[in-house]
Design a protein with these regions (language model features):
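Assembly/oligomerization scaffold segments
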Residues: 1-110, 164, 286
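Structural signature for extended repeat/solenoid scaffolds and their inter-repeat hinge/linker regions
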Residues: 181-185, 259, 367-621
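Short, well-ordered loop/turn sites that connect or cap secondary structure elements
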Residues: 53-54, 298, 314, 428
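A generic structural signal for residues embedded in beta-strands
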Residues: 61-63, 306, 433-436
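Extended, domain-scale alpha-helical bundle/helix-rich regions
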Residues: 69, 85-86, 115-134, 139, ...
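Short alpha-helix capping/helix-loop boundary micro-motifs
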Residues: 39-49, 283-294, 360, 417-423
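Short, solvent-exposed secondary-structure boundary/capping segments
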Residues: 81-96, 326-347, 383-388, 456-465
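Short, basic/aromatic beta-hairpin or loop at an interaction surface
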Residues: 27-39, 268-285, 400-415
């Protein structure tokens, strides 16, 4: 006669069909903010079950309740093992875990921008094809400008974000699914049907007509009394962002402080939230009550009130934080031992009036050294920056972005010199490769510390032929070609040293006091168009040897007052055509020796008044 589970305390529902797998026993655990795990010991008359029919597929257990209803344990079959059988039966062991556990099997590098943590969590779930979750959050959460999943599983990424924000979860089990419930407060919890209160019966009490607890333990542990956090905002460099939160306790040594930096916030209100949730997470461990008994309907996330205990202060409402189960069913074949207790549960509970928060156990990924990235921006732009000289980049590991102005947050750029409205600035341009470091190794906090050349963005001078050359060479924007640039270049080749300066258009030099030029040999200066020189005070010019001035067309020289010319030896002046001299007043001309005047043609002399000529000797004309 085929075996059946119709009359059993626990019914197995598997992809293999009715009564193919039967439960011998189960050990399981659940915890707020952690994954559940149910280990099923199963038996079957089929000794050759193909694991592919089970692995990765949903299974459930239906546990009969005293009221006639059922409680379900639903999960994904994540591992299967065949055991040595007994008689006509084969043994199997199957582990059930939540769908959330499957996120431990996938990892990514991904950037989220301008989203709250609940929005990020839901997007991760949906992108991976999961929809069995429920938002029971009551708090509001800040928008993260920039949040990175970096070389970590999607489970770790979501878990650490929840732990940071003080969000946790538990699972609601149904026959055909289990639902992840996001929680952050008392209002996210409720009582199980028929288990709003559960009595305590001492072990020696004989009449136990309903589900109950028979063992009670209370534990307390010294915790830190306060937590202070701090951070820095470059937009408010002098602002104090330190925050503090405390949970006072009456016992000795209950006030030891914790301090941490950075707190990963820019607004004090966000810091206060983080400080409060972290100290609440610590004090979630302060007091625990452990109850053992037979409360088949209670699991992690349920509320209930304990009744009947001899300490009145302990008859209060509790929140189940951890639940451990042990189920044993009677043997399907004679000769196998039966256990007296078909169901036992052990619950770790806390006072429901106290806030529960998950401890931050999931490690933050660390970027272990600098990376390179490519500067990006909108189509049609060559330089894309904001008022602080920040730029955006595409990381080589990011397979989701479009390499545009939305690829990253604005990232600060290290410069050679940075003062208050003074210093050096060279903005990385779109397409250039930059070196990116991360503050404290945090992928959420990038900073550009350098730039490098690559095969597309090559060096400005041909190497290694010009290895002795160094300098700076820019590129005109927009749409500048290799012929459009400003440049300062130094040639250090022995015997051919040179400092070369090229201005693509204008060059303006301002000297607020003295300027001195020294040229050890020749100087050549060519101006392709006009030159204007203005000296607002005196000008002295000295030529120790010859001076030659050649003027191709006209020359006009104007002296506002006196002009004095002293010639140490001879002077020769030649006018190729006419010369006109106009003297507004008197003229005195003195020749210390002879004067010869030769007029090849006519001469006209007109004296408007008297003329006096005194000749000491002869005169020949």
């Amino acid at each position: 006669m085929p075996i059946t589970q119709n009359t059993r305390l626990v019914h197995v529902d598997s992809p293999l069909g009715e009564d193919v797998l039967l439960l011998q026993g189960m050990e399981g655990s659940e915890e707020l903010g952690r994954l559940f795990h149910y280990e099923l010991d199963l038996t079957s008359e089929d000794r050759a079950i193909r694991f592919d029919q089970l692995l990765g597929k949903p299974m459930s257990l239906g546990l009969e309740l005293p009221s006639g209803g059922k409680r379900y344990f639903h999960g994904i079959a994540c591992s299967c093992r065949q055991l040595t059988g007994h008689g006509q039966f084969a043994g199997y062991r199957v582990s059930l875990r939540p769908w959330f556990w499957l996120l431990t099997r996938t990892s990514d590098c991904r950037i989220f921008q301008n989203k709250t943590v609940p929005d990020i969590i839901k997007q991760v779930f949906r992108d991976l094809g999961f929809s069995d979750f429920e938002d029971s959050l009551s708090a509001s959460y800040r928008e993260w400008e920039y949040c990175v999943q970096y070389r970590e599983t999607s489970f770790d990424f979501v878990s650490r974000l929840m732990e940071q924000e003080g969000i946790y979860y538990y699972f609601r089990h149904e026959k055909d699914r289990h639902v992840l419930v996001l929680a952050d407060a008392y209002g996210a919890h409720g009582t199980a049907p028929d288990y709003a209160s559960v009595p305590f019966y001492p072990p020696d009490q004989q009449m136990r007509e309903r589900d109950h607890f028979y063992d009670w333990q209370l534990a307390r542990e010294v915790q830190s009394g306060s937590l202070a956090l701090n951070d820095y905002d470059f937009l408010r460099p002098r602002a104090s962002l330190e925050v503090r939160s405390s949970v006072p306790r009456n016992h000795s040594n209950g006030d030891h402080p914790l301090y941490d930096y950075p707190g990963e916030y820019l607004q004090s209100s966000d810091g206060e939230h983080y400080a409060r949730t972290r100290i609440e997470a610590i004090h979630s461990q302060f007091e625990r009550v452990q109850l053992r008994g037979r409360a088949r309907g209670l699991g992690a996330g349920h509320l209930f009130k304990l009744t009947g205990y001899d300490r009145a202060d302990q008859n209060r409402e509790y929140l189940v934080v951890v639940a451990r189960y042990q189920i044993r069913q009677e043997a399907y074949e004679s000769g196998q031992a039966d256990l007296a207790e078909p169901f036992l549960s052990e619950l770790d509970c806390m006072d429901a009036s106290q806030a529960f928060r998950p401890l931050p156990l999931t490690p933050m990924p660390i970027v272990r050294g600098p990376q390179t990235a490519v500067v990006v921006g909108p189509d049609g732009e060559e330089i894309w920056t904001d008022q602080y000289g920040r730029v955006k980049v595409h990381f080589h590991w990011d397979r989701h972005d479009q390499s545009n102005e939305n690829s990253s947050c604005w990232i600060r750029v290290s410069q050679a010199w940075a003062g208050k409205n003074w210093g050096a600035i060279q903005l990385p341009r779109i397409g250039q490769e930059v070196i990116v470091s991360f503050l404290e190794g945090d992928p959420d906090r990038p900073i550009i510390t350098g730039r490098v050349y690559n095969a597309e963005q090559a060096v400005p001078y041909k190497l290694p032929a010009n290895a002795t050359q160094s300098g700076m060479k820019s590129r005109s924007s927009k749409e500048g070609s290799s012929a459009n640039f400003n440049e300062i270049r130094m040639e250090d080749k022995k015997g051919a040293e040179q400092l070369f300066i090229h201005a693509e258009k204008n060059q303006d030099i301002e000297v607020e006091n003295d300027e001195t030029h020294w040229v050890g040999h020749d100087r050549s200066k060519t101006i392709d168009n006009d030159e204007t020189v203005r000296v607002k005070h005196d000008r002295s010019e000295r030529v120790d040897n010859h001076e030659s001035i050649s003027i191709g067309v006209n020359r006009t020289e104007e002296v506002g007052n006196n002009e004095k010319i002293t010639i140490g030896v001879n002077r020769t002046e030649r006018v190729g055509s006419n010369e006109t001299i106009t003297i507004g007043a008197n003229r005195t001309e003195k020749v210390g020796a002879n004067e010869d005047i030769t007029i090849a043609s006519h001469r006209t002399e007109d004296v408007g008044g008297n003329e006096s000529i005194a000749i000491g000797g002869n005169r020949d004309e």
